Structures are given as C-alpha cells and as structure tokens.
C-alpha cells in the first residue's frame, strides 16, 4: 500500500478526532501515515505542494473533500491523483454515493483493501468544481436563511438550530422562480412555469442522506438533473414526503433527466454547491468532466 498523507480539518471536534485516531491505527498496520491539519486554503495549498507521490486521504465530510479536490484542480494536479476518503462528521453524502462505510475503522479497512475507481466532476462556467451536488431554489434558500440564523444563534451556543429554522421558514414561504433549465441544449422547463427546486447531481444525496438525485452515479459519465414544479401548498407537501422516500422522480410535477451540460437562467436565484452558497445569480451553467480523478472505493 502506498504511503499516505491524511489531510484533516484543524477545527474538527473531539469526537471526530477520536474517530480519526481509530482509523489511523488501522491504516498504520498497512503503511506509513502522516497527518496534516489545515485551517484555510493557504495552508491546504502548502500541504499539497509537499505531498509528493504519497496518496492523499481526506479525513472529513463533503466540505473537506470539496476543498481538497478544488485545490488540486486549480493546481492542475487532480487528473493524476488517486484520493482516499475517511468520512468524519454527520453529512458525508458523497461517501454514501460511492459506498464508503461511515464508521471510521470500517472506512480505513475499505481504504486499505479497496480499488481506485474514476470519478466524474461538475465544473461551472468559471472553472469552479462541484464534487457532489448543486441545487437552486428551495433548498438553497433554506441554507441561506439557516446560515443567517446560525450566525445569530451561535452567540447563544445554539447555532445548530439555524438550519431547521431556515428550512421551516422556507417551507412556509418558498421561493417560486421562473427559470429556463436546459440539459444538453434541450429545454426542460421554461419561463412560463414556476419552479420550486432544481438539482444537478453527481452524487445521490444532500443534507446527510436525502436522495435529491437518487439515480446519480459519480462514475457513469452523466449528470442527473431534477426539476420540481411542485408550487402549490399541497403539491409541496407531497413533494417533501416523496423526497424523503426518494420516490419524487416519478411524480407528475417533477422532471428527471440526464445529460452532460446544464444551464439555468431567469429570475434571481441562489445556488448551494457542495454546501457553499453563491448568489444572487441570473445565469449559471455546469458541465461534466469525465473521470476527473480516481477515488479508492470498497471492493465489490
């Protein structure tokens, strides 16, 4: 097994630290392991510069994986890399999509005995990458509102209530947008209809297991695009229930298509890309970059 460089978030909590130590104990039975903690993009870039030929392992959740993949992409080094992933924390949606165990020790065993598989990547019109999923509309608005409440409530030590409050406010008063969504140049929805949510998925789930694009596979060379036109109060309730079960793609007011290029334009909207908020926007586009890097996944 190649020597490993494990990159972790310097601000990880004590529970994550304990999980990581258990995983490192397993990995050190197989190879040499160095651990580096990074707190900002500058530190991460320095660690990557010194990585050499060691296999890089990301210890963290979707945000940590996004940060490392994005930095390697900017450096022009992603294509030649095989990465590993040790899921930590509570989200880990991309890990779920590729079948990585969420238990730290089991993930370390899978990493030690796994096989590299090519992974696709979403790249936007200015060259920024998305590893897992980008969505527009209700989910992004909930995240935006939740971030505001998290900031306010964090001063009282209850910042974790921010997102549920943001989601509740959005469910009561969601953004209904007039958008034109095109997939490979073909319109899926146009300005004559209101849209509740648009999702472009490389991975299946968001928010710690909600399968927003349940048929997505990050290695199949296609993007899954979901457009919800559930704009009435009752239809929104039904959509939310079906979303929880992963059956929403078959609903009459949901379009679920696949392609390699996606564009969204129209009224001002916000995007949530791998959990990072961006906006307001009038036009965004994304394309698939096939087999952009390799990731070690469990043997099947």
Predicted regions and their residues:
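Glycine-rich phosphate/pyrophosphate-binding beta-alpha loops
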Residues: 135, 139, 199-214, 277
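ATP/NTP phosphate-donor binding region
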Residues: 1-59, 66, 71, 105
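Glycine-rich beta-strand-to-loop/alpha-helix junction loops that act as flexible
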Residues: 10, 59-61, 86-88, 202
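ATP/nucleoside-binding phosphotransfer catalytic cores, i.e., glycine-rich phosphate-binding loops
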Residues: 183-190, 211, 217-300
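Short beta-strand/turn micro-motifs composed of small residues
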Residues: 7-8, 60, 229, 266
